[in-house]
Amino acid sequence: MGDCFENILRTASSLKLREPVIDTVIRFSEDMCRWLLHLHLKLGTDIEVITVGGNHDTQRLLESRPTFEDENLTKFVVAYMKQRYEGIIGVDINDYQDIAIKNIRGTNIMFCHGEDKDLSTTMDYFSNLYNVDIDEGYGGHLHRPESKAIGITEVGDRMFTRVGSIVGIDTFAKKIRVAARPSVYVALYTDNGKTWGRNYYL
């Protein structure tokens, strides 16, 4: 869901960095490759990897605002994973995207970073842009998990789920007065749609 890295978004960001950003990108890319291989072998099933960028991954090269949103460090992660998994059967690395829409067991799911305030409008926009009915959406950005019903579909309520952050609370979270433990979200889909979902706290 993006925000793989702290990056240097503002001067205060440099206080949080434990190593150069590029070194973090390389280490994170390798860690993801090892984790995906372990997951693939442990579950004994094929894995499709969908990666979208976030605002923290964007390079702010000339100004304080991320005017060059295509300058995203997550593209390096995707390129690295594609290189590592080239020719390996069972792990499919999708191209980098700012948003992705995938059909999982008959449910059309949108994956985005989630920085928009009105996520219902975001889902409607991309439904119209790509001419596909989006049943559910996933995003992050706010560093806390929450789910919201924003309509109905053939497979049930049209839900948007914000997933938590593996970082948990940071200075931005404190500034906007939100707090949540570091977490990841896992969901199970069958032909009847999403049948199970859970936050795992780290």
Language model regions located:
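Conserved beta-sheet core of the metallophosphoesterase superfamily
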Residues: E71, K75, M81-E86, D95-Y96, ...
